[in-house]
Design a protein with these regions (language model features):
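Membrane-water interface of transmembrane alpha-helices in multipass transporters/channels
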Residues: 32-39, 76, 232-241, 268-275, ...
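Transmembrane helix boundary and interhelical junction motifs in multipass membrane proteins
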Residues: 55-59, 218, 289-297, 328-333, ...
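Juxtamembrane helix-boundary/capping and inter-helix hinge elements in multi-pass membrane proteins
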Residues: 67-74, 109, 187-191, 199-202, ...
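Small-residue-enriched core segments of transmembrane alpha-helices in multipass membrane transport
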Residues: 81-91, 200-202, 240-256, 276-283, ...
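Helix-loop-helix junctions within the multi-pass membrane cores of secondary transporters/permeases
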Residues: 144, 279-362, 416
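Membrane-interface alpha-helices at helix entry/exit sites of multi-pass transporters
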Residues: 74-81, 206, 210, 306-320, ...
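Transmembrane alpha-helical segments and their short flanking loops
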Residues: 332-458
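Signature of multi-pass transmembrane helix bundles
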Residues: 3-9, 13, 20-28, 32, ...
Length: 458
């Protein structure tokens, strides 16, 4: 699998380079007709259409299956602490990314009415196809008592709202989360619904695997189209600003966000963690894979952070799978950047939808292979933003991914430290009662079980 992933990534980078080169040749050396340009554009649109077709179902089923997979009776306090930490750290990462990208690249004025209307859609099923938008319009005042000769204005500004085409991701995520909780509370009676949501989610991910093999070809044509359409070369400067925002977001989350969360729960010096796990961070920066870095991360947590070996080997694989802070920052910043590039005024509803969708995409990162380029398109199409411009991000996404992975691993290490601290009383009780019991029995007391009641392998 690792070799297949490597070949895929290399082919993607190769097609990006070829697409840029071909685009420059066609633009400056071999001008083409509008018909040929439209054919090239159509080949790239095939990729966007395929991803858009399954983007919304993937998000909805991921939320429902993820929530229903949480069974506190089986997983105990550790699972609850993991859920709280992952949600909290991801929310912090997304908030930092949004704050920076909206501050450095300001968007338009926000409308809170859109947020409230989309938060509680009239119909869960209609939310798949339309969302609420409002705008300020000028309307005439029809009043016979108005003295027009006096120079009084006969118009006023009024907020007008209506439902428009495009999925309401905010409403879908809220209601998917609610449905997941209700199904989970049904216990055994909801088992059929749980299995149906999980199998549908797995089926969509399998379809995505096949779609992603077309991605290098689609990206090739998208890059050609993007180069042909470039008229203002200030986009290069905008890309530089984007990279600055990303690295600033990584730094703020790593140096300020995570340490504050760690200190709030443990009341211990958070900066000792950096020295204890620096080997794992260097490995993550080199390999750009949280899974490949896991053995080194385990070693650092067990030997340097002094986390209980049994606890670490059972919880760290889970945390490293669903906790993707670096990716969350990248996705939310990239999505807002694309909107600003297209001169789209983002309402509060759009901003919240982008944040929630980025968080959900980061939770499911391990379930969708080669997610880097695909996730950006997934988020943009899910919230109704133009995904065609995402090709410009492919030029440096592979480079930023190395640093995003380092932030992911650092977040995992902080999380293990927090969860281990909160569960230390349970660990002591297990140590006292461990005599005469097998290792398997002890692990079952500490484990977070998958829905099929099998231990998650370390």
């Amino acid at each position: 699998m690792a070799n297949i992933t490597t070949v895929y990534q290399r082919s993607l980078l190769t097609m990006i380079a070829l697409g840029i080169g071909t685009g420059f040749l066609l633009k400056f050396r071999f001008p083409i007709s509008e018909t040929t340009e439209s054919l090239i554009d159509m080949a790239g649109d095939v990729l966007l259409t395929l991803l858009q077709m399954f983007a919304v179902p993937l998000i909805v089923t991921s939320v429902i299956s993820g929530v229903t997979a949480l069974n506190t009776k089986l997983s105990g306090k550790a699972a609850v602490y993991i859920l709280i930490y992952v949600c909290g750290s991801t929310a912090t990462a997304v908030s930092i990314g949004l704050f920076l990208v909206l501050t450095i690249e300001p968007g338009a004025d926000t409308e809170t009415e859109d947020f409230e209307s989309n938060m509680a859609p009239e119909s869960f099923f209609l939310a798949f196809f339309e969302h609420y938008e409002s705008e300020v319009v000028e309307v005439s005042l029809i009043d016979n008592n108005i003295d027009y000769e006096s120079g009084q204005n006969d118009t006023e500004l009024k907020i007008k709202g209506e439902y428009v085409d495009g999925a309401n991701m905010l409403g879908l995520i809220v209601w998917s989360f609610t449905i997941g909780i209700l199904i989970n509370r049904a216990g055994r009676r909801g088992k059929v619904a749980v299995n149906a949501a999980r199998e549908l989610n797995n089926a969509i991910k399998i379809i995505f695997k096949y779609i992603l093999w077309y991605m290098p070809i689609g990206i090739y044509f998208l890059m050609i189209t993007h180069v042909l359409e470039i008229e203002d070369w200030t986009e290069v400067i905008k890309l530089g600003k984007l990279i600055m925002v990303l690295f600033l977001g990584f730094a703020v989350h790593s140096i300020i966000g995570l340490p504050i969360i760690y200190f709030a729960f443990t009341r211990e010096n958070p900066f000792l963690i950096y020295r204890q796990v620096y080997k794992a961070l260097i490995n993550a920066l080199t390999m750009a894979s949280s899974s490949a870095t896991l053995p080194v991360t385990l070693q650092c947590c067990e030997e340097n952070m002094k986390v209980d070996v049994r606890f670490c080997r059972l919880t760290l694989p889970i945390v490293s799978t669903i906790n993707m802070n670096g990716m969350a920052i990248y996705e939310v910043v990239a999505a807002v950047f694309i909107a600003e590039l297209a001169h789209i005024n983002l309402s509060a509803s759009y901003i919240i939808s982008i944040g929630l969708t980025s968080a959900v995409a980061s939770f499911g990162a391990a379930g969708v292979p080669m997610l880097g380029p695909a996730s950006t398109i997934l988020i943009l199409t899910s919230v109704g933003l133009p995904a065609k411009d995402v090709s410009i991000l492919m030029v440096f996404e592979w480079f930023v991914d190395h640093f995003a992975t380092m932030v992911n691993v650092l977040g995992d290490c902080f999380g293990i430290g927090i969860i281990s601290h909160l569960c230390q009383n349970e660990l002591k009780e297990l140590d006292h009662s461990a005599s005469g019991r097998s290792i398997v029995q002890i692990e079952l007391d500490l484990s977070c079980l998958e829905p099929n009641d099998q231990l998650i392998p370390s």
